């Protein structure tokens, strides 16, 4: 597998960032669902949110790297089997996934810094609080964070189902290209 993307397939960096993001998103979603079940006297009550915040800030950095990488190493050319509607739907779906990722991280940041305190990322460094208002900010951002999380999980699951549909029903190379396999069916614009 090549380092950079080619017209036929994704490179190792893009594939690693894609799968790592997916694992982190589902792990963070599970952690978030578990955190809200903890009682004040549970040993993880204070520790779990700190882990959640730290991973969230690292995910933000990874997303920035991912976007820079995407500009440096553009994705493979669309398969010839894709209709114009399929290409437009894929572009819209990917944009929505990126927007939701940033929205969920920003809303999480606003929850975490509403009290004016910075976010400590595993004790390595701190992300300063910029916008602070301990009252409404935390409540509004918390509601948005919840909705963004559910939306992201539902849309990313749809993304996965669509990739599987391409692989098993359409029998095209969509999924293969994200796993490092090359495609000969690329480049035409319908």
PLM regions with names:
Residues 1-190:
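Membrane-embedded alpha-helical bundles that constitute the cytochrome b-like, heme-associated redox core
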